[in-house]
């Protein structure tokens, strides 16, 4: 099984889980941000040594609260690639509407060349209005009519940008005329003639896999048709199974079928301990800080009430609800094996990405989590952690 890691890139937060501290009342200085980066360097070396395939990082901006403080995943991933041997570095996710699509295409291509094909690209539409508006786009901010219109514009922008990126990567010359992007712009003079097309410099030296999160019905239909790999996170079992199978159905419909479990990734939040009590004692604060921070964005709306009914958009689950519904893992080695085995059997799972980055864990505790999963959970599950060889020319030295 391919096993990856995912980090939100959170500053050290020893008081995580304190119910009297609201997420927006937190404010951290630049020293705390730099300490997060130092932690990521250390954790990348651990992940590399233990055989994790890819370390995925998360893009966000202007987050004084300290939860997600890495604005450029390609740049930092390229740095980590220079400090590790085999680990791939991925972006989970580049917030595409907040980028100029041609700059994103250039930056990824250059980083992939420099690192010898060890970069993985993930693309998303974004979730945070503070970022989106400040960086020139819009994003939905809740479950209401205004958000629906913002979501429509955001989706259009994203899909056009992805068309531009793929044209630029794989066509020697390209032009594009859409609702939101026109390349080249009309009427550009250049050395005695007019510019009718563009050529991206550089291009990737390989066909690039593109990963995208799948949640909404529209995205479920878009991702397989666009040729992207699907990433699933924080879904109840019924919803997860339906979306997982729908991806394969669409691939079959368009004449590009997939094997069971192929081209789909399950992200699982996990904190394990030698005993269930130890895991709960140390994992509960991080779980509660994580859910408290993300609940206003609707991240846990896939949870269900005991009677099976839907929860509110801004639902904030307890750790017991997360564990009972198998949406997150906080428990013993055996608990983790049981839950991962459930998902493996349900989905024919081949690609697992573990989110270790519950707020409040120290550098040493995070390293311990990666060791426990690689050395105890996966062997007990009967799975070998398979790291893929690169399929690109060697890194530039």
Q: Where on the chain are the PLM-derived regions?
A:
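N-terminal beta1-alpha1-beta2 module of alpha/beta enzyme domains
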Residues: 1-87, 207-208, 391-397
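Hydrophobic faces of well-ordered beta-strands that scaffold small-molecule active sites
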Residues: 3-7, 55-57, 88-91, 119-123, ...
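Active-site mouth loops of central-metabolism enzymes
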Residues: 22-37, 94-102, 204-215, 270-273, ...
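Conserved, mostly hydrophobic/aromatic
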Residues: 51, 59, 80, 111, ...
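A conserved active-site cap/scaffold subdomain adjacent to cofactor or substrate pockets
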Residues: 213-239
